[in-house]
Amino acid sequence: MANRFAVILAAGQGTRMKSKLHKMLHPVAGRPMVQHVVDQLQQVNLNKIVTIVGFGAEKVKAQLGSSSEFAFQKEQLGTGHAVLQAEDLLKDEKGVTVVACGDTPLIRAETFEELIQYHKKTGAKASILTTKVENPTGYGRVVRNDQDEVERIVEHKDANEGERLIQEINTGTYCFDNQALFAALKEVSNDNAQGEYYLPDVIKILRHQGDTVSAFMTPDFDETIGINDRIALAEAEKIMKKRINEQHMRNGVSIIDPEQTYIEPDVQIESDVILHPGTVLKGETIIRTGAEIGPHSELKDCEVGEDTVIRHSVATSSKVGNRVNIGPYAHIRPESRVGNDTKVGNFVEIKKTNLGDHSKVSHLSYIGDADVGERVNVGCGTITVNYDGTNKYLTTIEDDAFIGCNSNLIAPVTVGKGSYVAAGSTITKNVPENALSIARARQTNKEEYASKFKK
């Protein structure tokens, strides 16, 4: 197989985004758009990827890391000039080079592969990825001759009235013979309305030399859209969301309302999971079979076990076991482990806590920096007081303990196995196994005293 290379154009300023964040780093489905392009290209067995950077170069390089080499475009003088910056890294290589834009995150690896194969099949020096659109305003037009061969690409601003009627457009993605590409780039001029060096002019140069130029048309216009402003960003987000959701549904996941369900690309969901409207699944979340998520729940970097139900709740960087019932309005904060057959009820916050199997924290409690054993019942209003203003401390509640309502456990403290904490207690010392601990003032009743306040 011939050597394969890629050049990704990511040097532009992206002023229409009106953002402090570099355009290429704006996320689509939770992942920077340029990262999507790199990820898809990596699937077509490339020998090298070169990303052209300019504005925000260091941030783009930090995002892509070792997945790409980089060339710097000091002045933004057009797409042809941008590709030319990769000359030192690629000029001596033999093979094919894919040129793609960093703001086209929806192009699939399969389409890149089809373009390369079509390029090889036609024996072309250059192949263009094209598509048809009803309103081609703003796009470069693909001009063909009477034999239906590609003659040139003309940018919208440079197109005459007849050329502007053409509906076949240049998507900005190409496949070139590598050495032919860099030879032709040196002949490109900036004699055009923008005063820039256009990459599409390479097509005209190669045709004048008698070289074959082919065009591979994708029927999916949505796949080719470039993102230049927030409107296009939202459209790309919508398309990517639909693509991801439909793939999960084909794999046996029930999504009640796909338009109201957001799933990022790295999320794994097993079959027979039900996702209700308002579900947001981010990062490397894993949902096991039979689980039911939502409505209105957000999980990030979590693992959720089989047959677990989570409603109206938020969980981050935590592991939830099998047959767990969470919510409504629970918050599972990072580094928590919720065991099997447990309950985390309404208005409960758990942080950096291990909650053992068959234990319950049913309502209105904060359990932070705690190790809770099995079969523990934590009553309503229980607080683990874990912070003294400087340091965090551990609360340990051993197996089969019972914590009464409205109790404060002042860490560091241990509640022993099988022990009881009476409702309303503030516990400052360890509670022995099987003991009853009461730490509250004795009740005093003053007869008829209330009548004094009514006078």
Curated annotation (Swiss-Prot):
Catalyzes the last two sequential reactions in the de novo biosynthetic pathway for UDP-N-acetylglucosamine (UDP-GlcNAc). The C-terminal domain catalyzes the transfer of acetyl group from acetyl coenzyme A to glucosamine-1-phosphate (GlcN-1-P) to produce N-acetylglucosamine-1-phosphate (GlcNAc-1-P), which is converted into UDP-GlcNAc by the transfer of uridine 5-monophosphate (from uridine 5-triphosphate), a reaction catalyzed by the N-terminal domain. Binds 1 Mg(2+) ion per subunit. It comes from the Bacteria. The keyword Protein transport does not apply. InterPro entries: Bifunctional_GlmU, GlmU-like, GlmU_C_LbH, Hexapep, Hexapep_transf_CS, NTP_transferase_dom, Nucleotide-diphossugar_trans, Trimer_LpxA-like_sf. Homotrimer. Pathway: Nucleotide-sugar biosynthesis; UDP-N-acetyl-alpha-D-glucosamine biosynthesis; N-acetyl-alpha-D-glucosamine 1-phosphate from alpha-D-glucosamine 6-phosphate (route II): step 2/2; Nucleotide-sugar biosynthesis; UDP-N-acetyl-alpha-D-glucosamine biosynthesis; UDP-N-acetyl-alpha-D-glucosamine from N-acetyl-alpha-D-glucosamine 1-phosphate: step 1/1; Bacterial outer membrane biogenesis; LPS lipid A biosynthesis. This is Bifunctional protein GlmU. GO terms for molecular function: glucosamine-1-phosphate N-acetyltransferase activity; magnesium ion binding; UDP-N-acetylglucosamine diphosphorylase activity. Residues 252-455 are annotated as: N-acetyltransferase. CDD domains: GT2_GlmU_N_bac, LbH_GlmU_C. Pfam families: Hexapep (PF00132), NTP_transferase (PF00483). One of its GO terms (biological process) is UDP-N-acetylglucosamine biosynthetic process. Residues 1-230 are annotated as: Pyrophosphorylase. The gene is glmU. UDP-N-acetyl-alpha-D-glucosamine binds at residues 9-12, 23, 73, 78-79, 140, 155, 170, 228, 333, 351, 366, 377. Mg(2+) binds at residues 103, 228. Residues 231-251 are annotated as: Linker. Acetyl-CoA binds at residues 386-387, 423, 440. It is found in: Cytoplasm. Its EC number is 2.7.7.23, 2.3.1.157. Its cofactor is Mg(2+).
